[in-house]
Amino acid sequence: MLIVDPKAAWATVGAAQSGAPGMNLNGDMARNAAIYFPRIKQADSQLGGQVETFVPCGVIAGVMARTDSQRGVWKAPAGLDASLSGVAGLQLDMTDAENGLLNPLGINCLRTFPVHGRVVWGSRTMRGADAAADEYKYVPVRRLALFLEESLYRGTQWVVFEPNDEPLWAQIRLNLGAFMHNLFRQGAFQGTAPRDAYFVKCDKETTTQNDINLGIVNIVVGFAPLKPAEFVIIKLQQMAGQIAT
């Protein structure tokens, strides 16, 4: 996930609002990126502790890492518990109305609240603008999908020298089903029952005879990150049925 800093010229909400369409990120690039506004103020140790303005990417990465370790990659790194530790202030203190102008554009705002201090107050990807209506609108949904893609791919590399038939497919369903069920029990997916939270499909429908001839096994995994039974689909492909030499 790419954390994008606001441009130096974005000194006002209006500048950010007018500049957002010019970021020139589309498709998967935008799905894998998130932008945060405004810049932050911190003490600069190289200037004797003088407070200076810095880009927020470092502290945002820290918030993400803290959220991952405490709650899981599926938890949004935003809200009152997503505090900006060590941040002395923000370049701009925003109102709810100003936040309401930027959030629908996919710009995540950093806010200051009484008692709670400075926090991350948005969790959208750069495909998160309301007008885009993208299934990867939210940072935790996209990061969970990336986590699943990598984990499931690595977890099925053993199939390469196995016969590409129903016993293999059944073992894949069993292994990946156990992995997904463990995440379900941790609260990664929506739904009170496993069937509403995730599914794993690997059979003669996903892997045709032509796929078998080509030495390919296809796996389809769905997970419900926002609402029960509303699945985001991940498709995996591995080599199988190869002859060890």
Question: What positions do the PLM features span?
Answer:
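Structured, hydrophobic secondary-structure cores that serve as assembly/anchoring elements
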Residues: 1-245
